[in-house]
Amino acid sequence: MSKDLEVAGRYANALFQVAQDKDLVDVFSEELTELKAALNANKDFVKLLENPTFTTEQKKNLASAVFEKINPTLRDFIYLLIDRSREDYLSVIADVYQKRVNDLRGVADADVYSVVPLSEQELTALSRVFAAKMNKTKLNIQNHIDKSLLGGVKVVIGTRIYDDSLKTKLKDMERQIKA
C-alpha cells in the first residue's frame, strides 16, 4: 500500500467512524461524492487549495466559501485536513470512505469488459451471479468495451478476475497444443 493511500485511509476511517457515531454515513457519502465531482471538474480550485503560498486561514476561507452548504462536521473535517496540510488527500479520502460505505452495505464495484455494450438485462444477470459469488448484496457494474477480447466477457471485482473471453480461451488452447 502506498504511503499516500495509507495516510488517506487513516483519515477516511476516522471520518467514517465519526459518521457512524453521528448517524451521518449516507449524508457524508453523498456530500463527498459531490465534493469529489466538484474537485475533478474544477482543477483551478484544487490548485488554489493546494497552493503552498496561501496561508491556512486563506485556504479555510476559500473552502468555507465553496463548501458552505455541506454538513458542518464534514466542513470541520476539511478544515482539519487544511490545518495538517493534507488537503491534497481529499479526493482519495472520498474514494476510501465510499469503499467503507460499500463494504458496510455489502456492495462491490465491478468492471465488466465486453466486445459490445451489454444490455441492462445482461448486466443485471451478471450482477446477480457475481454478487452471490462474492457474498455481496449488490454490484455496481461499469461496462467497458474491449474489442481485443474477441467475444465473451471479463469481470474484474477488486483483485479478482473472472475471464471468460474468447481471447483467453484461444490462448489456453494454444498453450495446451504446445504442451
UniProtKB/Swiss-Prot annotation:
* Xref: Gene3D superfamilies: N-terminal domain of the delta subunit of the F1F0-ATP synthase (1.10.520.20)
The keyword Mitochondrion appears for this protein: no
Annotated localization: Cell membrane
Which InterPro entries does this one have? ATP_synth_OSCP/delta_N_sf, ATPase_OSCP/dsu
Asked if the Swiss-Prot or TrEMBL record annotates the protein with the keyword Cell membrane, the reply is: yes
The entry's cellular-component GO terms read: plasma membrane; proton-transporting ATP synthase complex
Which controlled-vocabulary keywords does the entry list? ATP synthesis, Cell membrane, CF(1), Hydrogen ion transport, Ion transport, Membrane, Transport
Q: Which residues form a coiled coil?
A: none
A matching Pfam family: OSCP
Primary residence: membrane
Gene Ontology molecular function: proton-transporting ATP synthase activity, rotational mechanism
State the annotated membrane topology for this chain: Peripheral membrane protein
HAMAP family linked: ATP_synth_delta_bact
Q: NCBIfam families attached here?
A: ATP_synt_delta (TIGR01145), PRK05758.2-4 (NF004403)
Q: According to its UniProt record, which protein family does this protein belong to? A: Belongs to the ATPase delta chain family.
The entry describes its oligomerization and partners as: F-type ATPases have 2 components, F(1) - the catalytic core - and F(0) - the membrane proton channel. F(1) has five subunits: alpha(3), beta(3), gamma(1), delta(1), epsilon(1). F(0) has three main subunits: a(1), b(2) and c(10-14). The alpha and beta chains form an alternating ring which encloses part of the gamma chain. F(1) is attached to F(0) by a central stalk formed by the gamma and epsilon chains, while a peripheral stalk is formed by the delta and b chains.
**What does this gene product do?**
F(1)F(0) ATP synthase produces ATP from ADP in the presence of a proton or sodium gradient. F-type ATPases consist of two structural domains, F(1) containing the extramembraneous catalytic core and F(0) containing the membrane proton channel, linked together by a central stalk and a peripheral stalk. During catalysis, ATP synthesis in the catalytic domain of F(1) is coupled via a rotary mechanism of the central stalk subunits to proton translocation. This protein is part of the stalk that links CF(0) to CF(1). It either transmits conformational changes from CF(0) to CF(1) or is implicated in proton conduction.
Per its record, how is this protein called by name?
Answer: ATP synthase subunit delta
> Which source organism?
Listeria innocua serovar 6a (strain ATCC BAA-680 / CLIP 11262)
The root-end lineage is: Bacteria, Bacillati, Bacillota, Bacilli, Bacillales
